Structures are given as C-alpha cells and as structure tokens.
C-alpha cells in the first residue's frame, strides 16, 4: 500500500477547477482517484483496521495544504476569524486544546459500511472550535456489482428557501471533496451561509463500502454523533 501514500495523486489534480466547483456547488468530484485494485486493497485494510489506515493518514496534511486557501476564504466570507494555521499539525493541536479528541465518524472512524436494507441518515460535521470546512469521501465498491441503490446524497439548506438535493454519481475509486457543513454563497447583498448535509440512500442489495476522511476531530461528546447514527 506504499503507493497509496504518494502525494502525486493529489499534486496532479486540477485544484483551480476543484476550488471553482466547491465555490459553486459545495462539492467537487475526483474521478478515478484510485484504481480498482487500489480501491479493493484499501477496502480490505480499512475493514481490518481499528482506525484510519496509515496509508490514508498521510493524505490528511496533503489535502489540508491544497484546501487551506479555500477554507480560509470561506471562513472570511462567513465572518469567522482568525484564519486556520498554515500547518496541519498546528491545526490539530488547536483541536486537541479545545477538547476535540474523538475520531469521526463512529462507530468505526473513517470507514463507511451500509448493509443491505440500510441507509445513512443526513449528517454534517461542524461541531467544535477547530473545524475544517471540507472533507473527502471515497467509494471502495462498484455500483451495480457490489451493491444496488446507495446513492450518495447531499442537501443544501438556504435561508427562506427549500432545501436543494444533489446526488453525486460515484463509481469504484471515485472520490469527492464536499463541505462538512456551512459554506458561503454570494447573493445580491453579499455572502450568506448555507448548510450542507450528506447521506447514503437505502441500499437495496449488497453492501456500500467507502471511506470518509475528515481533517478535524470531534469534541468528546459531539451532538452530531449523538443524534445521527449510521443504520
């Protein structure tokens, strides 16, 4: 799994395009981030691990570096100060000092498993003082072969408007960068906040297996994890 540690897979991405799509929609697809073989190998390793696999742990500071400018711009547009630290290690230290020591999601950090007839309810990860507004999701199984149903769904709630649903068409090895919760949207009178949540619809056959990589930890008793469970 050493090749999964490589920073090259992220360095070769079009981060200008990714930032533009995140500004416009709150999500950006990363098609074929992993090959089929890499996806299967990572699925086996993630299922056997008690936490985040080491090969993916190395992705966190890399993603942080690529997304930091956008994250700080979002914070500024939402009236949040001060800016995030330039180093991922310093950001994590801020979280620990604020009591954010709980890996997420639970019950198995970072691994998403939704069995047949199950679904994942709408949720977001915006609890705590040190929150990074973006995260990665990655599909480790093949739609139509390993499972049926199980669409990755996002909803965007805007002030005084109906919620906007979105379906992300993920395939084996595809990833997406999505907002963890609030994000700014430019309106006629300036920027305003919208809130995004994500879910996995009912799995009709097989098992949905993926990875959810957050760049911040949760408080010891976060509200989101108490009220929303993977079913």
Q: What are the roles of these predicted feature ranges?
A:
Residues 1-231:
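Fe(II)/2-oxoglutarate oxygenase catalytic core
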